[in-house]
């Protein structure tokens, strides 16, 4: 599924620029808001089902006290945790929000989220909901190693989104059609109309340096034949695990930041879709299967496709819904076979994911997911070799252990005609997302235009929202940081 929250600004701007028949705002008009979120619990505990949208009347001025009261109220409603744990977590977010940029970069970037929120001394539910749940299911990074700067930046953005501050829209938005129909196909058509040529099935093998510049890219066609691509400028928009294979010794020597990319870590976050013979809109939003060993997140998609009759428009006429699931944990044993996802066959993964979802949705007497209603499933073909000693994943996700920021490259490289774009490039959102990739591409275009001396207009790169009320507190924290003092709100 595609999750496009209101904290995004650069990607939504691109969506507005892609024409779509009947839409005044292009593909952006294909975004629809979800209204709920659920934390599915196991062991007979009731699931936590909450409204999830911008609040009606946010405070006009956000003081630290107003922030703590608002966040405490939200957490009391959402988590049912002990009062002292809620108070502590709210305080930790306030510490981050009022931390100066230097403290964020030099301290919190090196601090694991688990330690920042003192998860080791808190209840199992605190650990599951606020420490692990905010990291493994969202950024596919273990809480014990995830950068506090990355996790808290994301949390800060969502808090302001819920408050209606600086948002492009509601905090949870999805597409009103399958992704290809709502976005990709119109985008491809638009780019082709502008003269873009796509070469599907081709691979970049090497970038060759001559005279301090990239002279050619060596590529292979679908038949494996090597060819040379010569250009004035090269924009490399590839996932980091693929891009760094193309940087030979000479290219790496020309720009040390490329060699540092070898330290960037990736992990598996891969999707599976279950096709059901009856509509199964469990909630109008995403479900975080918070207790699932494989860190599952799911959403029922047909409820958003109002212009489609799913049985008539797709498949063999018997499928009525699509339950789309992200699997974020591939290295822990499941509940059926005692094997990790990487050790399971494709069939075993489907059975295991289905069982884990039922464990959280069917455990309180309701029959939400029924085996008899399962028509078929589809696991991302990017994963291969499952059930063998050598599983592979061609589409891994950048993860964010402490210190990751310092290994992320800029879009502009020391090679004057090579520019980088991708979710691993350093951008304001500091999270491997479609928004981050989009922002990095805008940076790359601007750097290329600068390098070529072009008089063309530059791309707008929009950062995350920052509350102006906290600017003075952050300046005060800058002084405290220079003096070696903790943040004024930091209780330890």
Specify the residue positions occupied by each region the protein language model found.
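Dinucleotide-binding Rossmann-like beta1-alpha1 core, especially the glycine-rich loop
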Residues: 1-88
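Conserved beta-strand->loop/alpha-helix structural units within folded catalytic cores of enzymes
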Residues: 8, 120, 194-196, 200, ...
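Amphipathic alpha-helical segments that form well-ordered structural scaffolds
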Residues: 10-17, 112, 116, 182-193, ...
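Rossmann-like nucleotide/phosphate-binding core characteristic of flavoprotein oxidoreductases
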Residues: 68-138, 347, 351-373, 403-406, ...
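Active-site/ligand-binding neighborhood in enzyme catalytic cores
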Residues: 76-213
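C-terminal segments that line or cap access tunnels to active or ligand-binding sites in enzymes
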Residues: 164-175, 231-233, 238-408, 414-439, ...
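Conserved beta-strand-loop-beta-strand element in the redox core of flavoprotein oxidoreductases
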Residues: 208-229
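Active-site-proximal substrate-binding core of FAD-dependent oxidoreductases
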Residues: 447-492
């Amino acid at each position: 599924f595609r999750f496009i929250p209101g904290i995004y600004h650069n990607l939504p701007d691109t969506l507005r620029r892609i024409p779509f028949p009947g839409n005044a705002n292009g593909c952006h008009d294909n975004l629809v808001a979800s209204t709920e979120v659920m934390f599915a619990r196991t062991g007979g505990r009731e699931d936590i089902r909450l409204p999830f949208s911008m609040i009606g009347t946010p405070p006009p001025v956000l003081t630290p006290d107003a922030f703590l009261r608002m966040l405490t109220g939200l957490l009391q409603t959402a988590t049912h945790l002990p009062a002292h744990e809620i108070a502590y977590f709210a305080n930790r977010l306030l510490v981050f929000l009022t931390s100066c940029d230097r403290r964020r970069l030099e301290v919190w970037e090196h601090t694991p989220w688990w330690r920042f929120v003192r998860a080791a001394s808190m209840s199992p539910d605190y650990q599951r909901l606020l420490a692990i749940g905010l990291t493994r299911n969202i950024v596919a990074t273990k809480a014990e190693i995830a950068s506090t700067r990355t996790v808290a930046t994301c949390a800060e953005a969502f808090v302001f989104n819920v408050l209606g501050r600086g948002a492009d829209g509601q905090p949870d938005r999805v597409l009103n059609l399958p992704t290809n129909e709502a976005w990709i196909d119109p985008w491809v058509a638009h780019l082709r109309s502008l003269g873009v040529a796509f070469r599907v099935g081709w691979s970049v093998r090497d970038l060759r340096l001559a005279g301090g510049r990239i002279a050619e890219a060596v590529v292979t066609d679908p038949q494996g034949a090597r060819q040379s691509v010569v250009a004035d400028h090269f924009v490399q928009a590839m996932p980091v695990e693929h891009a760094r294979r193309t940087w030979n010794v000479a290219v790496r020597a020309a720009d040390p930041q490329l060699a540092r990319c070898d330290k960037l870590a990736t992990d598996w976050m891969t999707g599976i879709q279950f096709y059901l013979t009856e509509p199964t809109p469990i909630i109008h939003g995403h479900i975080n299967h918070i207790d699932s060993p494989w860190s599952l997140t799911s959403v029922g998609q047909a409820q958003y496709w109002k212009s489609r009759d799913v049985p008539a428009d797709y498949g063999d006429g018997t499928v009525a819904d699509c339950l789309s699931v992200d699997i974020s944990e591939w290295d822990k044993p499941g509940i059926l076979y005692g094997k990790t996802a990487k050790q399971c066959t494709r069939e075993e993964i489907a059975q295991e994911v289905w069982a884990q979802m039922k464990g959280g949705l069917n455990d309180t007497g309701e029959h939400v997911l029924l085996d008899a209603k399962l028509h078929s499933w589809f696991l991302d073909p990017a994963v291969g070799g499952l059930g063998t000693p050598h599983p592979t994943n061609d589409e891994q996700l950048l993860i964010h252990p402490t210190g990751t920021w310092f290994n992320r490259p800029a879009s502009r490289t020391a090679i004057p005609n090579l520019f980088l774009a991708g979710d691993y490039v350093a951008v304001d959102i500091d999270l491997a997302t479609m928004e981050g990739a989009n922002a990095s591409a805008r940076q790359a275009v601007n750097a290329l235009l600068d390098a070529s001396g072009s008089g063309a207009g530059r791309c707008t790169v929009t950062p995350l929202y920052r509350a102006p009320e906290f600017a003075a507190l952050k300046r005060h924290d800058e002084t405290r940081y220079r003096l070696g003092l903790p943040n004024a709100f930091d209780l330890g």
